[in-house]
Amino acid sequence: MLERLGLETALRLLIRRFQHTHGARTQYRASPPREHLPRPAQEVIYRVAQECLLNVAKHSGATSVNLSLRSTDKKIRLSVRDNGAGFCADQALSKPKSFGLAGMRERALLLGGTLSILTAPGKGTEVTLDLPAPVVLNGKNSRIVD
């Protein structure tokens, strides 16, 4: 779907499906990158958004979710914030079955990016993905080419 529709449309469809299925009020704001993003960067952004929404549906009980995609000359940032139950991030990351959180972080690292999780029990969760622009592969200063 991502390859056929492009990142912006794929994200909007993902969010629409999430809203329809789970009923949480969902806002999406975007200032898409000025340049075409390489396919690996688009995939990471989409998969992190998808995993965040899946986690909201499975664990948080949130009634409101805000997603934003912003781009500057130095970075591309995806932020997903909810008003749900929150959790203890250190405990969740150390669990043997926390493949989703670990997978998101691994995807970010592969492109020289970072993934941060700001949460606490009862306080909701904010997941922030930062990818360098131009996106780099494995921390090396080289562009990824489609």
Q: PLM features: residue spans?
A:
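Coiled-coil dimerization/phosphotransfer module
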Residues: 1-146
